[in-house]
């Protein structure tokens, strides 16, 4: 329905929804006949969940099972069946060349599918540093930890009762014996202590996992903040989804080494604090897996930085920033483009321009019911502004072919910039955007066809081939992501990662994790992904989501200062005035960030 807004007196269609799967929806604007173009929906942002609806159900059930098992363990009533011992002779393993990470994950039990999602997220981050090997922990063989620079184990299955321990005794023993960094996240650290001897564990690490639990005072509490490097990071997990944070039982006195508290969790109701991440000897322990309900200022930042300690400890402090201009189509307003470009040039700020080469309004939503298609070649004034941008510090980026899907409402109206292109979606009765999966025709050939047509659109307008890609509304299939990697040097975006990817099976489009990064990574699709991690300017509240103003972007940039070599990367729609962009850039620069172009982000 139409309602009047104060901005220039123009009518605006109410925003319908944000993506409640891995990415968010946004706002759709309408202009009077004869105007250049509607303002697209601001949909390219990550949802605080970062898991698909099916994976959300898994998460809730796993949280309940964790709490039940933890209570049984506290009373001594939880029986843990050890993993079977495989009698094999292990040959000496040669270390991997260069920096390498071993990511071990759980994949057994009724919610074992969560383990692969978390492992992909971890492998992606570790891909910033070097090569990554990810495998189920059950496939671990003796001596493997010494083959890699560092090892990360993700304890997502709470072993006990009807779910036998899948962690081989060899891993427990090797994690204890090695001098190489081991990062343990979440469950089953108590089983390691039991396997190697509780006293021996205590004497090496200075704490007792067998006396550490998720509840304190009979409750998980209301942990809503994690402090790390003087940055207050958010932790916002709704009731019923929270599996808690382990409260480590630290030991003091003769015979126990000092334990370093790296990050501190705080209960928002009681004010009580406890360690969220600790380190002693070669072991770093995090009290929860931090990949669900993430935000731009989230506690996942702690893990993103701690990986430097394990994989690149000599890294020098460096903080860079990046801005890209979003959703520029052949129907963009040249004067608006020129205004933004002039400001960025005056500040000597390099930037990216995300361009959609073909505009389509197949049902005439913004053209009085008359279908409309406009190519870049048919928009010389827009192309002139794009060329001026390229001559003054901009880098051309490809933002889809049409940024919409046929004549379908996908999920809104079929118009370029508003709808998904490489994924199907609908709006449910609660005004949530739900991802339905890839289009029926999705394939390598189909995706390549759209890319080929997009590149032809740039060439026909006399523009160079874009080196970088950003997926419309940040959603595509695993097949599409691999095709994109064959056509562009990198993607600059947030992405979806589907169950089945690590195992080499058919991707499960109903189970995925969405992720964004504070630095460049080589992801599990084999593609370089450049960061966008602090979101975008959006001045109006919509879909129960508050406005995101310059102060919010700056606050997220401040939180990301905790990443020792991180980026504060955001995007801005050029139909908005220059002033909010100026405020955002000045605020980020005041934090000590240096703005760079997109190609520098991979360095």
Model regions: which residues?
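C-terminal domain-boundary segment and adjacent tail
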Residues: 131-136, 307-317, 335, 339-362, ...
């Amino acid at each position: 329905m139409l309602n009047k807004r104060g901005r220039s007196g123009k009518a605006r269609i109410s925003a319908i929804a944000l993506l409640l799967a891995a990415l968010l929806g946004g706002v759709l604007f309408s202009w009077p006949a004869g105007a250049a173009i509607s303002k697209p929906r601001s949909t390219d942002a990550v949802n605080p969940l970062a898991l698909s609806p099916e994976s959300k159900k898994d998460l809730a059930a796993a949280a309940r099972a964790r709490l039940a098992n933890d209570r049984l363990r506290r009373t001594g009533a939880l029986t843990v069946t050890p993993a079977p011992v495989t009698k094999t002779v292990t040959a000496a393993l040669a270390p991997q060349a260069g920096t390498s990470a071993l990511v071990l994950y759980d994949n057994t039990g009724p919610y074992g599918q969560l383990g692969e999602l978390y492992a992909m997220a971890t492998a992606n981050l570790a891909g910033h540093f070097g090569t990554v090997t990810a495998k189920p922990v059950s496939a671990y063989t003796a001596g493997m930890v010494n083959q890699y620079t560092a090892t990360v184990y993700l304890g997502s299955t709470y072993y006990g009762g009807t779910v036998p321990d899948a962690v081989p005794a060899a891993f427990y023993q090797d994690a204890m014996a090695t001098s190489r960094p081991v990062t343990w996240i979440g469950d089953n650290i108590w089983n390691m202590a039991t396997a190697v001897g509780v006293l021996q564990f205590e004497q090496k690490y200075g704490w007792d996992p067998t006396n550490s639990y998720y509840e304190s005072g009979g409750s998980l509490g209301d942990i809503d903040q994690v402090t790390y490097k003087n940055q207050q990071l958010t932790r916002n997990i709704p009731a019923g989804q929270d599996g808690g944070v382990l409260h480590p039982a630290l030991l003091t006195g003769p015979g126990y080494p000092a334990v370093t508290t790296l990050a501190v969790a705080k209960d928002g109701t009681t004010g009580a604090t406890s360690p969220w991440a600790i380190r002693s000897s070669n072991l770093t322990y995090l009290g929860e897996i931090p990949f669900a309900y993430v935000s731009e200022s989230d506690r996942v930042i702690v893990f993103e930085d701690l990986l430097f300690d394990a994989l690149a400890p000599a890294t020098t402090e460096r903080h860079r920033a990046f801005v890209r201009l979003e959703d520029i189509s052949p129907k963009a307003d040249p004067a608006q483009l020129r205004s933004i470009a002039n400001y960025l040039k005056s500040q000597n700020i390099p930037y990216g321009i995300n361009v959609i080469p073909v505009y389509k309004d197949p049902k005439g939503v913004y053209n009085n019911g008359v279908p409309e298609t406009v190519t870049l070649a048919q928009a010389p004034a827009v192309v002139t502004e794009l060329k001026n941008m390229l001559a003054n510090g901009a880098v051309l980026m490809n933002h889809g072919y049409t940024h919409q899907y046929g004549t379908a409402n996908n999920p809104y109206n079929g118009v370029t910039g508003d709808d998904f292109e490489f994924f199907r979606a609908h709006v449910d009765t609660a005004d949530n955007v739900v991802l339905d999966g890839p289009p029926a025709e999705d394939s390598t050939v189909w995706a390549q066809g759209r890319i080929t047509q997009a590149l032809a659109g740039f060439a026909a307008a006399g523009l160079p081939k874009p080196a970088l890609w950003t997926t419309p509304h940040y959603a595509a299939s695993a097949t599409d992501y691999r095709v994109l990697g064959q056509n562009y040097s990198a993607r600059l975006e947030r992405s979806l990662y589907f169950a089945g990817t690590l195992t080499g099976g058919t991707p499960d489009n109903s189970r995925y994790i969405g992720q964004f990064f504070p630095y460049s990574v080589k992801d599990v699709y084999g593609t370089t992904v450049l960061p966008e991690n602090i979101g975008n300017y959006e001045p109006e509240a919509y879909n129960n989501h508050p406005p995101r103003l310059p102060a919010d972007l700056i606050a997220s940039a401040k939180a990301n200062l905790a990443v020792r070599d991180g980026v504060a990367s955001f995007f801005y729609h050029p139909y908005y005035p220059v002033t909010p962009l100026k405020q955002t850039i000045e605020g980020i620069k005041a934090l000590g960030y240096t703005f760079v172009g997109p190609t520098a982000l991979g360095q």
